[in-house]
């Protein structure tokens, strides 16, 4: 199975459930609570990912990274930003030094 297919299916599932019944869907429940709650979850998952990495627990790191990506995709969906736009930005940056890319943004 292609990894991109997994992300595309996840994005479609999130979009489908976004406006669903909050009692039946975690995605709908998060969206019903608003953007601030979704953003809070992204922050929490980011912190948990960092903690797992520093603890050296590979299995926990993989699980937390998956949670982080999921919640980031929920946030992007809530803001009507297709994941393809993020991938396009990564493609645009490919082959560019991180230092040079950052300098180009500060001008």
Curated annotation (Swiss-Prot):
CDD domains: NTP-PPase_HisIE_like (cd11534)
Locations listed in the record: Cytoplasm
Catalytically driven reaction(s): 1-(5-phospho-beta-D-ribosyl)-ATP + H2O = 1-(5-phospho-beta-D-ribosyl)-5'-AMP + diphosphate + H(+)
Alphabetical UniProt keywords: Amino-acid biosynthesis, ATP-binding, Cytoplasm, Histidine biosynthesis, Hydrolase, Nucleotide-binding
EC number: 3.6.1.31
GO CC aspect terms: cytoplasm
InterPro entries per the UniProt record, alphabetical: HisE, PRib-ATP_PPHydrolase-like
Enzyme's top EC category: hydrolase
GO MF annotation, one: phosphoribosyl-ATP diphosphatase activity
Pathway as given in its UniProt record: Amino-acid biosynthesis; L-histidine biosynthesis; L-histidine from 5-phospho-alpha-D-ribose 1-diphosphate: step 2/9
Gene Ontology biological process terms, A to Z: L-histidine biosynthetic process
Cross-referenced PANTHER family: HISTIDINE BIOSYNTHESIS BIFUNCTIONAL PROTEIN, HISTIDINE BIOSYNTHESIS BIFUNCTIONAL PROTEIN HISIE
UniProt family annotation: Belongs to the PRA-PH family.
Name assigned to this protein: Phosphoribosyl-ATP pyrophosphatase
